[in-house]
Each structure stands twice: as structure tokens, then as C-alpha cells.
């Protein structure tokens, strides 16, 4: 089957309403892009929990609607334009064909083995490991965050490789796919816990961990609180985002044993000062490494009696 895309360039004020109207008029899907992408006028829009973007579209937006090839695209545009109070003649559009493809093969071709650090490979299931003697994780792109391709995941993996947690306990908070927990287990940790607020992430992590023959226990936060497991760890890793990390500073710091280490990522280089300040009452953090504008922060508690929180 083939499809036809309707491409419309509009001002920000009409982008969201026109997108909804195109869906109502019969489009199969609609996306909004920056019409100036790749030019000097490109306008980045991004956010994170507690810091959402103030605008839902770009000043100069491109609305792309996917339709069946046999549909009347002009009628769809006219109906959508009328719904948002525009004359059909005021909404210029172009059409482009989308041919049928082998989407499985196309998707697989976009994911090659990833080499991380000195000796870690993340390998999709349809590839062979380039170096079977390396630390190899078989991991397919899926529903949970974490395949090693993002700089923050890479930074945490490189830290773990540089500081092998042999015989130590490790907490991966915000575990996503379980990739960091699995690396810790393969590097010698004998007690690895992964925690995530998303049940789907826990499901994905369990699947990945079984596939990779690792020993990791995964919990939702409330489940961990009642698990009876020790609540402090030799190493705590959290690859989330700056704002949640700041909010969780007392809790995450309290999970670190005296003499233990805390590693944070999901932090932009421009956010180092504010994140470090949030943790300053509990632990001193410094930049361990930076990659593509993202950093890993690391710190160590002084040795002493355990005082972690439950």
C-alpha cells in the first residue's frame, strides 16, 4: 500500500488547531515540524518535567499529514481549513508520495552495534557481536529508554567500566531498559537493584536482563520500599533529567552508603551548577566527563556510620 503526505507551512498560531482539524478530516496521522530546520533560523523547542516548552509549535511550522493515496487530499485540506476559520485558498499545500517499504528491515538497518568505552558493545539481536570477548549486551530498541546511543547513557556506562563495582551493591534509579543495571552486573556487582516509576520499563528491563543472563532485581518505588532489601548502596546511578534529579537530591543521596559513590547524568553542561547546588548539603559532586553537551556528575560520601534513609 502507498500513501500520500500533505505538506502545509503555517504560522505557529494555526499549527496545532490545523493538525487537529486534519485528523478530523481523515488524515491517518499528523506531525508538526520546524519549517526552518537545518537553517540559521532553526528554532529548538525542548523541555523536561517541570520545565516544559512554553510553545507547542514553531514560529514557522510545517504540518505533515499522512493520507491514503486514494483520498481526496484537496478536500481534506479544505475541510480542515474551514474548521479553523481559514479559507481553503489561504492554505497552500504540496503533496509527496510515500511508497511501501519493508519497515522491519529499514528499522533494523538504522541500528548497528554500538561500541562504548574500552570494551563494551551494545548489539541488536539481528547482529553478531563484533568482539565476542568483550562485555556484550544484546539489546533491541524498544519501549524503554536506554540503548547506549544517548550521550548520558554512554557516560554512565563508561563510568561503570572505569570503576568496576566488583562485589559491590549498585542501585540504578530510573533504570529504563535496565542497561546500566546489566552493565553493573556484568562488571562484577553481586547485588544490583533497578527502580523505575514506569511499569512498562520494569517489564522491558526484566526481559532484557533475562536475555542477557544477568542477576538484577527490579522494582517500582513503592515495591522497593516494602521489599525488605537494604536501602543503601555502594554505588547509586541515576540517569534521568536535571529537574527530577534536583527534586530527588535528599532521597538519592540518602541511598548512598558511607564511603559510597553517586553518579548522575541526564544533566546538560549548562545545568551543572544548579544540580550540584541541590546536592551540596548531602554530597559534593564534580563533573566526571562531558559528551556532546551532556555531563556525568560523580561524588563520594566520606566513610562513617551508615545513616541512609528508608
Curated annotation (Swiss-Prot):
Keyword set, alphabetical order? Cytoplasm, Methyltransferase, S-adenosyl-L-methionine, Transferase
How is this protein annotated for GO cellular component?
Answer: cytosol
Q: Where does S-adenosyl-L-methionine bind?
A: 153, 174, 196, 239
Pfam families in UniProt = PrmA
**Entry function:** Methylates ribosomal protein L11.
Similarity annotation: Belongs to the methyltransferase superfamily. PrmA family.
Task: Please give the name of this protein.
Answer: Ribosomal protein L11 methyltransferase
Q: Which organism is it from?
A: Janthinobacterium sp. (strain Marseille)
Amino acid at each position: 500500500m502507498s500513501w500520500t503526505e500533505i505538506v502545509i507551512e503555517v504560522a505557529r498560531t494555526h499549527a496545532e488547531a490545523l493538525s487537529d482539524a486534519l485528523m478530523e478530516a481523515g488524515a491517518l496521522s499528523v506531525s508538526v515540524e520546524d519549517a526552518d530546520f537545518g537553517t540559521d533560523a532553526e528554532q529548538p523547542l525542548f523541555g523536561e518535567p517541570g520545565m516544559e516548552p512554553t510553545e507547542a509549535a514553531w514560529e514557522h511550522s510545517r504540518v505533515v499529514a499522512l493520507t491514503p493515496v486514494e483520498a481526496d487530499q484537496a478536500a481534506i485540506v479544505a475541510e480542515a481549513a474551514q474548521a479553523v476559520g481559514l479559507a481553503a485558498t489561504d492554505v497552500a499545500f504540496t503533496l509527496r508520495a510515500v511508497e511501501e517499504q519493508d519497515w522491519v528491515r529499514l528499522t533494523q538497518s538504522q541500528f548497528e552495534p554500538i561500541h562504548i568505552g574500552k570494551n563494551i558493545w551494545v548489539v541488536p539481536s539481528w547482529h553478531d557481536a563484533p568482539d565476542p570477548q568483550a562485555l556484550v549486551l544484546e539489546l533491541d530498541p524498544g519501549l524503554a529508554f536506554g540503548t547506549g546511543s544517548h550521550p548520558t547513557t554512554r557516560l554512565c556506562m563508561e563510568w561503570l567500566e572505569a570503576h568496576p563495582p566488583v562485589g559491590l551493591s549498585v542501585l540504578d534509579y530510573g533504570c529504563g531498559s535496565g542497561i546500566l543495571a546489566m552493565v553493573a552486573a556484568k562488571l562484577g556487582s553481586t547485588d544490583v537493584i533497578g527502580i523505575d516509576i514506569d511499569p512498562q520499563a520494569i517489564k522491558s528491563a526484566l526481559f532484557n536482563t533475562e536475555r542477557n543472563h544477568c542477576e538484577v532485581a527490579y522494582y517500582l518505588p513503592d515495591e522497593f520500599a516494602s521489599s525488605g532489601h537494604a536501602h543503601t548502596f555502594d554505588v547509586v546511578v541515576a540517569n534521568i533529567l536535571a529537574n527530577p534529579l534536583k527534586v530527588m537530591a535528599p532521597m538519592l543521596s540518602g541511598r548512598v552508603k558511607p564511603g559510597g559513590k553517586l553518579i548522575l547524568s541526564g544533566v546538560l553542561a549548562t545545568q551543572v551548577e544548579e544540580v550540584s547546588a541541590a546536592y551540596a548539603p548531602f554530597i559534593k559532586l564534580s563533573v566526571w566527563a562531558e559528551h556532546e553537551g551532556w555531563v556525568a556528575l560523580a561524588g563520594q560520601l566520606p566513610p562513617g556510620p551508615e545513616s541512609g534513609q528508608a
